[in-house]
Amino acid sequence: MKLLYTTCAALMMVAITSCDEHREFPDTAMKTCDILCTDGKVVRYEDMKSQGKQPIAVVFHINQNNETQGTGYAVYLWDIAPEAYSDSVGVKHNTSANITAFDGNMNTHSMYSSGVSPAATAVFDMWQYGQSAYIPSVAEIRLLYGAKNTVNDYIKKCGGDVISDDPDECWYWTSTEVKDMESAKAWLFSLASGTLQETPKEQPHKVRPIITLYN
């Protein structure tokens, strides 16, 4: 009986010790509406403010599968002023022309390499912080459209350009050319309604760059 009491007491001490050693650890997993800063760190908005970091983008998608590259996407805080997809008529920019592909980064490089894409050049010119921003593909900008209402508050808090519902201000270039019309048209996307529109590539329209995250 004495042995039984001793064993029970020992077990109780282990349980108490285990409880005493329990610690609450902060949740550091990246989440939608986290902030990408100019130092490359992704942090909560409150931490960005308290640490005096400079924001550059807001996380709008977390990768849950292998369909997209990296761990997620962030949207740049500001619009790029209207630019033509191409300043030369009749040029293919060798994008995939696949509206379901998450390949905006590759598409933008193809556009830039052509030497005749003002929109792609404008995006490359903003790389002062080393962030590899690019023009989203149709599939990627659809993800942004789905998260717009969630991230807009944080874009505003960070001093960025809120994604507008104004029908005259909501149209953005994607990096995806129109299949079988690659030399003439690319897809324009409404971030107000989710509508796609075939558009002549020499027309100037806004760009909202995004960034692939690998945090």
Regions found by a protein language model. Give the residues of each.
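Long, low-complexity intrinsically disordered regions enriched in Pro/Ser/Thr and acidic residues
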Residues: 9, 19-22
